[in-house]
């Protein structure tokens, strides 16, 4: 055991704010299931200004980091290499430390989104809608670039956000049309709707959900279910939640950081559900 502990066995999630993060619950559940009793997974409040110093202070015991806002772009200059997936959206949520000391960045949000959708039977769609703009919305576009064969409509609040989303569409090879947020209820005509906005933002839209809608992917996990997700399910639609995304992206992180595959998806999901239920 002593020789194992001398190797890479530490990981953590960084961000600001970070107290609410479920990542420690998910990763620790994976370690327990995999028999990695000597592995540790922590949580650190780190903002953009503090990130370089934090990274510089890490030693050879560290296997990897999970990153949340506002660090997903700030970390990129501090890395030795970045995966094509992360580079495509200029966002890194996973850092893996190799045996030779290199720091490689990846984005598991995008394949995590795809895995969560496929788990609910969504393999390909003719069109899709995205509610909101920003880092999560750009990841949604990257995921849609692989499963949407038609147009994506993004509902946003400003001309600047509209231009940003169209720019991401061009970069990712997705046909993106933008519409004003005041018309967001029209999104529900699409077979797949991805809601990427903060808690409460879509509550007023719940009354507009039609009977037998398609699939809603609401990236929030707390509070859950959201008002929109509740209405969607009540009207016969399929719902994919933020915990689904969180678990699937964490599975990929565990596999990269520990070198063990497959990670215990169901044990991690159960731990996440229990943690949310106790809050």
Where do the language-model regions lie?
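Glycine-rich adenosine-cofactor-binding loop
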Residues: 15, 107-110, 117-146, 156-157
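Adenosine-phosphate binding glycine-rich loop
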Residues: 219-279
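Phosphate/diphosphate ligand-binding glycine-rich loop within oxidoreductases
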Residues: 2-120, 223
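Short, conserved loop/helix-junction motifs that constitute active-site signature segments
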Residues: 4-5, 122-124, 146-148, 207-214
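NAD(P)-binding Rossmann-fold cofactor-contacting core
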Residues: 149-172
